[in-house]
């Protein structure tokens, strides 16, 4: 008789899960070894050491509509570079780089926010667009910097040529033009500036220091002559004396410039608070948009009222006031674009009475704020006819308070400010690299030329414009 089984003996024992064996066999899907977490997933093949077969044609490295292609086509087939080529002569030694190569590199760099010669040197080595534009040649930073310095005036002339291409592309209307200015830092510290009053004090101090060193040097010379004989060269000036004489010379030069400027303005002498900077004497201390005092230049733009915001003229001054810039900007706009704009608008910084009189004589429909807070006040539109005895400022004040005047002036802000925002924020241009008003003016035109290139490229119309050109 079989033995009876207990309840425990009758229970079914489930199969236990078997551990997944680890393996280092390649994954069929990826060809990669399993690496623990995530190893069961499939990824695209990745091998940094894989040999690539790149096209030997550098032109195939860039997409069809790339900015680099626009710049290459523009430099090769449109721009007149005769001024640049005329400066080269047949000399012995290694031949220089092709000017088109360096020009393309500069234009692409400035249009991409790369301004310094050292960064441009690295870009020519590392960035595909720059290697395409330079045909895979790598000029050093000294060559790039010297090319920019040597041909700065010729580069300025290219601004007008690029503007003409923008006109042919239909990006310019020249109906309403807005003027505006901004303060951009000079390549100099405001702490290197000194007032005229302080210069007079320091001049006396340095004169005493120099005289003391000269007397000490003379005494040493006499003592050494008695001991060693009169066989010294006599040009072994102490380092402290050389430094003091150098500072005294620079101080006198800056002081003389202030005095000359005062005489040209019909004044006997400069005010004690007037300053000069020793690093860049032509720059001035100005108040920027953040209400901070900076060593800067006053940079001006004339912007066309279209969705493309093309810059028609770009100038630089070293006076904080915008008033002296209005007429030069108007003339430059007419020269660059080939005609005078129908209408202009500007803020209160340009409202000098002589400016308003000239604009009226030229028949230009101008809308210029007369008071700084004029358009922040809620005032009713004027009624009735204006008095015959009203002066230019009163007439302009009344004109800009009309319904049409308010609309035009409100439009000004949306026309003039975007280029400054793109140049400062988009390109990152906030300080000049060069020094001196002439060089800074050239650098500003190069920056705005590059800005217009970006507008031309972004419009998508550059191919047809280059074909017409």
Where are these predicted regions, by residue range?
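Basic, short loop/linker segments at the boundary and entry of helix-turn-helix/winged-helix-like folds
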Residues: 62-107, 112
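Anion-binding and metal-coordination hotspots
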Residues: 1-28, 34-35, 39, 45, ...
């Amino acid at each position: 008789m079989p033995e009876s089984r207990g309840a425990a003996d009758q229970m079914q024992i489930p199969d236990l899960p078997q551990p997944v064996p680890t393996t280092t066999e390649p994954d069929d899907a990826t060809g990669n070894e399993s690496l623990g977490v995530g190893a069961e997933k499939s990824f695209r093949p990745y091998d940094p050491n894989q040999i690539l077969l790149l096209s030997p044609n550098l032109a195939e490295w860039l997409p069809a509509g790339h900015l680099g292609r626009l710049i290459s086509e523009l430099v090769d087939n449109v721009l007149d570079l005769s001024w640049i080529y005329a400066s080269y002569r047949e000399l012995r030694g290694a031949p220089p780089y092709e000017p088109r190569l360096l020009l393309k590199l500069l234009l692409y760099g400035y249009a991409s926010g790369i301004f310094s010669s050292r960064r441009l040197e690295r870009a020519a080595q590392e960035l595909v667009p720059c290697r395409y534009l330079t045909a895979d040649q790598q000029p050093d930073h000294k060559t790039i910097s010297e090319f920019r310095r040597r041909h700065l005036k010729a580069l300025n002339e290219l601004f007008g040529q690029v503007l003409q291409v923008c006109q042919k592309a239909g990006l310019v209307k020249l109906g309403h033009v807005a003027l505006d200015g901004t303060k951009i830092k000079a390549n100099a510290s405001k702490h290197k500036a000194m007032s005229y009053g302080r210069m007079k004090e320091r001049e006396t101090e340095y004169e005493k220091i120099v005289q003391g060193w000269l007397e000490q040097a003379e005494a040493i010379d006499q003592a050494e002559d008695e001991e060693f004989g009169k066989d010294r060269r006599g040009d072994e000036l102490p380092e402290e004396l050389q430094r003091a004489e150098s500072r005294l010379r620079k101080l006198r030069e800056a002081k003389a410039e202030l005095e000359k400027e005062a005489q040209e303005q019909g004044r006997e002498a400069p005010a004690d608070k007037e300053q000069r900077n020793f690093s860049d004497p032509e720059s001035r201390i100005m108040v920027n948009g953040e209400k901070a005092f900076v060593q800067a230049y006053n940079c001006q733009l004339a912007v066309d009222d279209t969705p493309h915001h093309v810059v028609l003229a770009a100038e630089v001054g070293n006076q904080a006031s915008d008033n002296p810039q209005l007429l030069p900007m108007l003339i430059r706009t007419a020269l660059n674009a080939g005609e005078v704009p129908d209408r202009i608008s500007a803020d209160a910084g340009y409202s000098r009475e002589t400016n308003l009189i000239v604009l009226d004589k030229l028949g230009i429909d101008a809308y210029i704020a007369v008071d700084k807070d004029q358009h922040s006040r809620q005032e009713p539109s004027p009624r009735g006819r204006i008095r015959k005895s009203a002066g230019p400022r009163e007439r302009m004040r009344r004109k800009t308070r009309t319904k049409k005047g308010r609309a035009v002036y409100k439009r000004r802000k949306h026309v003039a400010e975007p280029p400054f925002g793109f140049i400062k924020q988009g390109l990152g241009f906030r300080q000049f690299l060069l020094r001196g008003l002439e060089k800074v003016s050239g650098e500003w035109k190069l920056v705005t030329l590059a800005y217009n290139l970006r507008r031309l490229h972004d419009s998508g119309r550059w191919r047809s414009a280059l074909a017409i050109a």
